[in-house]
């Protein structure tokens, strides 16, 4: 049988926890993320040229302006802390079903910042060890 490669992005996190994580904490797609995660206070004294609400556009502009290095560091820290605190819900998620539908010949590559895929992987490992590789 042929190997499968599955690439996951922000939409996968949204699909995995549409009602929030184990404690109701919500995720966000890139557009509007700053507001949805309550990070607006970081940009109060920042003058952005971009009119985009996409965090990738905002982050790119902040990184190009040396006067905002402290804002970038704080934004990175708060984003990391926010996503790192997610806990997978008790009922199986789409991550569980995806992992269990693949085998050790397959690969799941993710660009997500949260630990949900890894948490689902650990949970699925209690059922079988014939699991896909994670990148």
Descriptions of predicted regions:
Residues 1-120, 125-129:
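Gly/serine-rich nucleotide phosphate-binding loop at the start of the catalytic core
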Residues 130-135:
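Acidic, His- and aromatic-enriched active-site or binding-groove loops in soluble protein domains
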């Amino acid at each position: 049988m042929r190997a499968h490669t599955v690439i996951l992005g922000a939409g996968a996190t949204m699909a995995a926890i549409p009602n929030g994580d184990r404690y109701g904490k919500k995720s966000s797609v890139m557009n509007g993320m700053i507001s949805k995660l309550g990070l607006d206070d970081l940009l109060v004294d920042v003058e952005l040229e971009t009119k985009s609400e996409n965090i990738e556009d905002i982050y790119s502009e902040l990184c190009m302006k040396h006067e905002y290095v402290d804002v970038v560091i704080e934004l990175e820290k708060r984003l990391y802390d926010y996503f790192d605190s997610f806990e997978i819900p008790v009922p199986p998620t789409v991550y569980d079903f995806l992992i269990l539908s693949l085998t050790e010949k397959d690969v799941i590559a993710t660009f997500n910042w949260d630990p949900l895929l890894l948490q689902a992987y650990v949970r699925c490992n209690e059922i079988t060890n014939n699991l896909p590789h994670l990148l």
